[in-house]
Amino acid sequence: MGTKWTEEQELAINTRKCNLLVAAAAGSGKTAVLVERIIKMITEGENPVDIDKLLVVTFTNAAASEMRERIGDAISKALEKDPSSKVLQRQLALLNRASITTMHSFCLEVIKNNFHLIDLDPGFRIGDQTECELIKQDILADLFEDMYAKDDECFKDLVEAYGGSKSDDNLNSIILKFYNFIMSGPWPEAWLKDKVEEFNINSIEELEGKKWIEVLKESIILDLNNAYSMLTQARDIAEMGGGLEPYLVNINPEIIQVEELKIALSEGIVKFYNNLMGASFGRLKSVRKASVDDERALEKTKSLRDESKKIIENLRDNVFETSLEEAVLGMKKMYPLMKCLSGLVIEFSNRYRDKKREKDILDFNDLEHLCLEILIDKDEEGNIKPSQVALEFKDRFEEVLVDEYQDSNTIQETIVGMVSRRDIENPNVFMVGDVKQSIYKFRQANPELFLEKYINYREFEDSNRKIMLYKNFRSREEIINGVNYIFKTLMSNTVGELEYDEKEALNLGASYGELNEENVEKEYIDEIENLKVAGDIELNILNKAGNKDYSDEDELGEEEEDLDSIQLEARIIGKKINELMNPEDGSHYMVFDKDLGKYRKIKYKDIVILLRATKNWAETFVDELGTYGIPVYADTGTGYFQTIEIRTILALLHIIDNPMQDIYILSALRSPIFSFTSEEFADLRLLNKDKYFFEIIKEVVDGIYDESISKDLKGKCKYFLDYLNKWREKAAYMPIDEFIWFLYSDTSYYGYVGTMPNGVQRQANLRILFQRAKQYESTSFKGLFNFINFINKLKKSSGDMGSAKILGENENVVRIMSIHKSKGLEFPVVILGGTGKQFNKMDLREDILLHETLGIGTNCIDIKKRIKYDTLQKHAIKKKCELEVLSEEMRILYVAFTRAKEKLIITGAVSDLEKSCENWCKASASSEDNRINPGNVLKGKSYLDWIGMALTKHKDGDAIRNIGNGDITLNLDDKSNWSFKSWDRSELLETNNNKKEKNNIDIFESNNWIESKKDIKEVIEIRDRLGFKYKYIESCNTPSNISVTELKRAHQEEEFMQESYNIIDNESNEENKKEKIKRKPRFMEERQEEFSAAKKGTITHFVMQHIDLDKVTYIDEIREEVLKMVKKELLTEEEGKVVNVFKIQKFFKSDLGQRMLSSYKSGKKVYRELPFITEIPSSIIEKNLDPKIYGEEKVRLQGIIDAFFKEEDGYVLLDYKTDYVKEGEEENFINKYKIQINLYKDTLNKILGEEVKEAYLYSFYLEKELKI
């Protein structure tokens, strides 16, 4: 019995003689439809098409192989039914010749068959990516050397503007960025020259009609609509009475003002700018709370009005930070620099092309561009037309079928146009894909190509037709309903680039059947009532502020967290997995197995954890889930170069190339190959402290130090030197791959690592290094030195490689993967983790932004004045790129949701759940109908923000609305079911380590294995050893070095414990100690869109340290000082923007600030940010120490004193604080820092040799001084 196709699928399979776009949603069976269409074309009808007359373009090689295999299987099955069919026999014979291929492979075939047309050596090869990167670096170095030799002024200005302070690396990166970007288009040089000319502008009038101006207008109208919506909502609330009528005096004119701005914008950017500069929001009329019926209505009205005011002010102060005249002058000023830069990019491109021709190599960009060169000609007027080769392809291919069309880029689109009849008679292009799953912008995928056809093609018979497949055959109804709810609420033309409405919604196509005795595994037939399937979509939120007395998010940010939120979230996931695998109520969670045709108990391999990015997350998840006894595998793509076996071999290669490298020689000697000990290293170093280890080893072997070292050590040194000399000789003539395998064999290291834990994996890693060496041997580089450079470049360009993959598809483990890698796959249970992670907008902060349609967005840089600011064009491009980034994030979220077949669990973390829920409710309340308006969706900083906003409108969102005090109209028609749980930190502090230890003790104490008195004696001895307690255990808990902050925190924890419990003995104190997990250093963390309170505090301290005390009287002076720090690159632009100059001025106007300035102006020195190290008695840290034993023991204390200054009668100490402080809680605040300030006083007393007369805290939050 054949497959039962839906009506829409039948149309997609059978429709001919047109350009056909098939919009196939997730799980709609598009691959099956595509295969069936091909099968019918080559086997049915009066004149079946030979399969080699079809061009089938897939996105990956794996997809091409699968397609070929499925077509082959279908033909073979048909032949079984009709063995005599000549048509089927012919198609099977032609299958290997069929063009079922990726675009790159097709281009390669075109080039190989037509190399003579482009003067290409037929012996060319595809260059290794790292080899090509090395060639690029060499070319850049030569190019810059030549440019410096020319002493070109424009080039020097370009270096000054973009080169960086210490090297040209930044400008190198910009050139490579331009090159890689333009090569994704069909006409790179023409595009670049055209976009540079956009800077050659002479008047304001020329702005109108520019594409980027139109985009800027679209962005502005979005902001104006948002402001208008908020003001009208504020007006509606105020008009309801209740004492809010005075607000209408402001709000009604402001509504008119926004309407006038919208009209002005429609008349042109100049008119709008003039109106915007005249726009103002007056002081809101005061309303006494006592006269208001509903205080919440008052706050909501004020909030809506304030938000709309901020939108207008942002347009005026940030987007139009310069006048239109200055904007035009700025672009004109940048024209010579952009022309110089484009010239460098073109020169680099030409040199790189020539070098590749010289070496007879091509890269992947060449494949598409050279193919296009073969496929096009130009007429006498320079117009592009198909070449003879292209015309032959148009005749040859009966149809061109493009899979995953949403991921095509512009050059690929051009190639398809050249080999097909898309734009002429008898159109023949079949395109299938789903624009909602276009997630490869970083590969220059252009979803607009799909969208343009999606909008313009018709759903009925026409030369350009579209068919929509939205029946999902993958997921349960519970998943379908959840997906539809979230994306109907969030996805729009603005964010997602497509309106997700009823037409776009998924329709249920999968049939799972009821859970009953007939379709369940035999062993569970008697437990039908005790079996579970599917269930609600679950949202689990980690509240990082949970169980802490934080009344403001700033306070949370200022103090370092005790637990890393990634680890805590992993624990939530661990608990959820264990709930599925072994429910506490004794039930069993079941999934449907298609192969069995029935329900079975869930296995670990049914579960996948999806993350936006696995870096920094997957390793932590693996470690944490392991403590829950969960088998888990993560293909992180990293960690390869950090494995001990690879580090050892690379160390050997380094010293074979150059033994004068102590780090590498110590690594090699310490390895099992030579087994030197630390004591032996010390002995060698003591022989000579100035020479390299290699030189010392040679002298040892030569007998110079015979009286100073043992015979064993001399023997080891000789053994090492003999092997090293042998290897250096062989490395000089052996190919590097053969030499590496020789090393494995000669050292027996390959066999040795196989005996280590995880030995199979380690040997696989060594084989990968061998394969890498083999690839290197096929490049134009030779020798060990260049191979080491090759590996170093590989590390730098790729960051790292993943370890060798030895895991089979059927291994029973939970898999962790990125959402991108999950595309095209499906899993019974999907756990979407890390949804609280902020969107990565780092690319938007770069000096130069590039956009295929809008061109080049750069800062205006005044080299002489040393200032830079965004051009108006950059504002427009930045806004467009941000919309595209967020649209892609929306589509990535859609891909994640639609991987789930039966169960979806979502986890994420927020700093403060109450604040997050409030923000989600605000976004929802200010959005009309059942959708979140696009302006509010754009404010979301993470997937969790989006999901949270959507659920505020859902009937199951009570918990979120209650926490966020939301008064929101609900979408009561939705059928999806959601459950919500917030997790406090305290619920997750307990790890499974205690359980593991207890299990080990239970096993140990079970004496079933004791068979003799000898065994008993050994048990007692082992217990005695394990039970040994060190006599001076207290001193082990006392650090030798401690910072003031750590000491302060330790005392605060102790005080908290004493307040909570009257008496805490040692045992309970141990049980209640907070679990500490090391966090990554700040520089290793991904940069967030907004600065934390702690970071803002650090910036404030930095400004207070470096600000010129002669320039702190006026706001403008302080602003100028901050700007100087930004220009000198002491602060980044973003850091400069968060400096609160008003708060700083308030300090210097305070009594304490005036005393500091008075001291400074009288010639006395003001000390700022003074680091110190001193000694304190260890009893201050650990009060349990016996003074008789530890009385003389000292601990080093280190810290930094913010400021102190001299007055006539003594010194004044000052410490700045940026913490949040409640009014009236100053005393608690002082107590919190009293230990710290007293330690500072004692230290200064020692340093200065006289008493510090006064000590103060200055609270920037309260804007006042607090005397200690």
UniProtKB/Swiss-Prot annotation:
KW Translocase (keyword) present: no
Domain (UvrD-like helicase ATP-binding) ranges: 3-476
Listed transmembrane segments: none
Known cofactor(s): Mg(2+)
UniProt keyword Nucleotide-binding present: yes
Residues given in the record as ATP binding sites: A24, A25, A26, G27, S28, G29, K30, T31
Annotated catalysed reactions: Couples ATP hydrolysis with the unwinding of duplex DNA by translocating in the 3'-5' direction; ATP + H2O = ADP + phosphate + H(+)
CDD domains given in the database record: DEXQc_UvrD (cd17932)
Disulfide bonds, paired cysteine numbers: none
The name this protein goes by in its record: ATP-dependent helicase/nuclease subunit A
Natural source organism: Clostridium perfringens (strain 13 / Type A)
Taxonomy of the source species: Bacteria, Bacillati, Bacillota, Clostridia, Eubacteriales
Gene designation per UniProt: addA
